[in-house]
A protein has these predicted regions:
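Thiol-based oxidoreductase modules, predominantly thioredoxin-like and allied folds used
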Residues: 87-118, 131-146
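Conserved redox-active cysteine motifs that mediate thiol-disulfide chemistry
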Residues: 57, 62-81, 113-114
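A short beta-strand-turn-helix
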Residues: 35-58, 81-93
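Well-ordered, non-membrane alpha-helical segments in soluble/globular domains
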Residues: 73-90, 117-123
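Boundary/junction segments of secreted and surface-exposed precursor proteins
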Residues: 23-32, 135
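Bacterial Sec-dependent N-terminal signal peptides
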Residues: 1-27
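Loop/turn elements at helix/coil->beta-strand transitions in domains of secreted/extracellular proteins
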Residues: 53-59, 98-104, 131-135, 159-161, ...
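Thiol/disulfide oxidoreductase modules built on the thioredoxin-like
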Residues: 52, 141-168
Length: 168
């Protein structure tokens, strides 16, 4: 029966991709690579100096604009809610009653352009920028990266999306 074969194929694929995701991370207890990156608003962010050294837990969403599961996760607003309620006091989009202990970044780690992030081209399902209150970092060649995707490689990203939590 074709339906049973499709179910078995789906289960097999899910299992394979699940095991792949187990290896798409830095080992627990390891020290996350430091970075100094500039967001779409020309603000420079230093992971340790600006955030973890000051006590912030940092969430980093590595995604690709063409990735359907990335888009679904982004539009679930999970990280937006975290940022609005726990982000740095005084940052745009952060509630005045924030716990002031979290920072969130979105990194387009596959070398796609800001135009793609804005919803045009690259197979993107929509506009990633509008309504995103936390910093968005584009890693295409025009943003100063000699090797687009190098930050994703440094962070051992082998699939999209990959979300890291970096603790102080």
């Amino acid at each position: 029966n074709l339906s049973i074969m499709n179910k078995h194929l789906l289960i097999t694929l899910i299992t394979l991709f699940s095991f792949q995701r187990l290896f798409a991370q830095l080992p627990n207890g390891s020290i996350a690579p430091d970075f100094e990156l500039t967001d779409l608003n020309s603000v420079t962010h230093k992971l340790y100096e600006d955030y973890t050294d000051l006590g912030y837990t940092v969430f980093i969403d590595f995604s690709a604009v063409w990735c359907g599961p990335c888009w679904s996760y982004h539009t679930s607003h999970a990280l937006k809610d975290v940022y609005e309620n726990h982000g740095p006091l005084g940052h745009p989009g952060v509630n005045a009653s924030t716990t002031n202990d979290v920072m969130v970044f979105f990194i387009e780690g596959d070398g796609n352009s800001e135009t793609c992030l804005g919803g045009t081209g690259c197979g993107t399902p929509g506009d990633w920028i509008t309504g995103t209150p936390y910093p968005i970092i584009c890693t295409d060649a025009s943003s100063g990266f000699g090797n687009p995707g190098s930050i994703a490689s440094t962070w051992a990203v082998s699939g999209w999306p990959t979300v890291y939590q970096v603790c102080p």
